[in-house]
Amino acid sequence: MAAAALGQIWARKFLSVPWLLCGPRRYASSSFKAADLQLEMTQKPHKKPGPGEPLVFGKTFTDHMLMVEWSDKGWGQPRIQPFQNLTLHPASSSLHYSLQLFEGMKAFKGKDQQVRLFRPWLNMDRMLRSAMRLCLPSFDKLELLECIRRLIEVDKDWVPDAAGTSLYVRPVLIGNEPSLGVSQPTRALLFVILCPVGTYFPGGSVTPVSLLADPAFIRAWVGGVGNYKLGGNYGPTVLVQQEALKQGCEQVLWLYGPDHQLTEVGTMNIFVYWTHEDGVLELVTPPLNGVILPGVVRQSLLDLAQTWGEFRVVERTITTKQLLQALEEGRVREVFGSGTACQVCPVHRILYKDRNLHIPTMENGPELILRFQKELKEIQYGIRAHEWMFPV
């Protein structure tokens, strides 16, 4: 108990300002500038996917990428260049010690042919927080966003316009120290690549998934780095995902603590739409307590629901005991995950301690999920103007 309490105090006081633990040169105000952006167009453009051609997530890349190098002397000039392999020293710290972070966001092409990014400011905020946590160099968020906008502008013909498609944007920042010592890197590399994508899960946006909830596996913990988007958080989940598939489930429901708190679904945030034990209809999602990744779509669903004002919206711990009781009493309406890749994903079954728990999400419409999906689609594809969208 004492250790847990100390961990929570440490998380509150120090994880919010991790730059205090790193050398000051990484957090100087200097940054690369979009005005200095250099452009080298490809001489060998790739064949673009044709109309109706399946867009498997993360398999197809556009013609160009953004690259910015950093050393302890500061940032170099940003450049847009032909998509190409990286050249890394075999001792690069990103390869050995996971000094790497990434982001994921989407650009959408509306019927007016305007390309728009969805709430990219939140991604820039989160990326900078992740950089500070790893003692990687700071940067100006608006300058990076402008460089990304220019990159998308160069490859705008790659943005698909079919229903459910988008351009996935993957910014990455890695330590590139050519040394086997575990230390703050004096070299780093920031790059951005683009992928035209379709729906994340086979079957479309309303295909429900089943979850393996095994308390033997833990994704993140208080005082750790589960609330940052770091590459090292994802590799260890592959084995558990394979175990879920072996047991007939599509995804993993990550549990935490002796009371088996619901935290995340695969790489998604989790929501429960139910009648609380006090009789009030509510939408609940776990709080940002250091274990949960602050998802952009998560925040968007909370914002939308609060705007509607039709039911209680709350960030609160959810335990498996509470979920089991609510299922037995018929109070659960919908359970779903949210994330940039999948947007909103229904859950229809949870395998927990050899028990198959039926979740009545699909029997209930899923009314709330479909409403969220409709609202997001109208905003993202420019069907109605919204301040969340950033024009390219």
From Swiss-Prot:
GO terms for biological process: L-leucine biosynthetic process; L-valine biosynthetic process; lipid metabolic process. It catalyses: L-leucine + 2-oxoglutarate = 4-methyl-2-oxopentanoate + L-glutamate; L-isoleucine + 2-oxoglutarate = (S)-3-methyl-2-oxopentanoate + L-glutamate; L-valine + 2-oxoglutarate = 3-methyl-2-oxobutanoate + L-glutamate. GO terms for cellular component: mitochondrion. Keywords: Acetylation, Amino-acid biosynthesis, Aminotransferase, Branched-chain amino acid biosynthesis, Lipid metabolism, Mitochondrion, Pyridoxal phosphate, Transferase, Transit peptide. GO terms for molecular function: L-isoleucine-2-oxoglutarate transaminase activity; L-leucine-2-oxoglutarate transaminase activity; L-valine-2-oxoglutarate transaminase activity. The modification N6-(pyridoxal phosphate)lysine is found at K229. Its main location: mitochondrion. It comes from the Eukaryota. Pfam families: Aminotran_4. The modification N6-acetyllysine is found at K321. Substrate binds at Y168. Its EC number is 2.6.1.42. Residues 1-27 form a transit peptide. It is found in: Mitochondrion. InterPro entries: Aminotrans_IV, Aminotrans_IV_CS, Aminotransferase-like, B_amino_transII, BCAT-like_C, BCAT-like_N, BCAT_family. Its cofactor is pyridoxal 5'-phosphate. Homodimer. Catalyzes the first reaction in the catabolism of the essential branched chain amino acids leucine, isoleucine, and valine. May also function as a transporter of branched chain alpha-keto acids. Belongs to the class-IV pyridoxal-phosphate-dependent aminotransferase family. This is Branched-chain-amino-acid aminotransferase, mitochondrial. It comes from Pongo abelii.
